[in-house]
Amino acid sequence: PIREWADFDPAEAPDITEERRWSGVAGARERAGDQYLLASGISLYERVHFLRGLENTWTDLYTNPEDLRSLIDILVEMNLYAIKRYQAAEADGFIFCDDWGLQDRLMISPEKWREFWKPAYARVYAAARAAGLQTFLHSCGYITDILPDLIEIGLDVIQMDQQENMGLDNLSRF
């Protein structure tokens, strides 16, 4: 965990390019055959709050925005590398899981989401689509307020477990 930003050293981030991390990807297309091969990326929001803690993550939006952006950028770069590996492995799609919703609203204001997270998602989705991968996001809770943004930046498929709390009629407009 990164309890204090003074303890944060980007050089200590895991080296995602180490070959041992990719041993399970070799032969994935052959094992999948003609089945859809969905590759998993590194969640952006979930990983940040796992590293910083939930309270620190929300506070960082206001008190340490540049440090927060630096951490998000590292995770984006890791995903960009992963996308290249998954493209080479002939994956069909790319997913990560970030639960943005509560039962009846986002956990973050749409404005702060657009300021901090939308640009990061946009970079990942652009790279995935350029690599020929469909983009997927799993997110629980009420996320209607950012669905247009996600679609705008290249999300192809949203997977959710709580669609009833947003109203199926409401979701059908997307």
Regions found by a protein language model. Give the residues of each.
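Alpha-helix N-cap recognition
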Residues: P1-E4
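Active-site loop segments of alpha/beta catalytic cores
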Residues: D7-F174
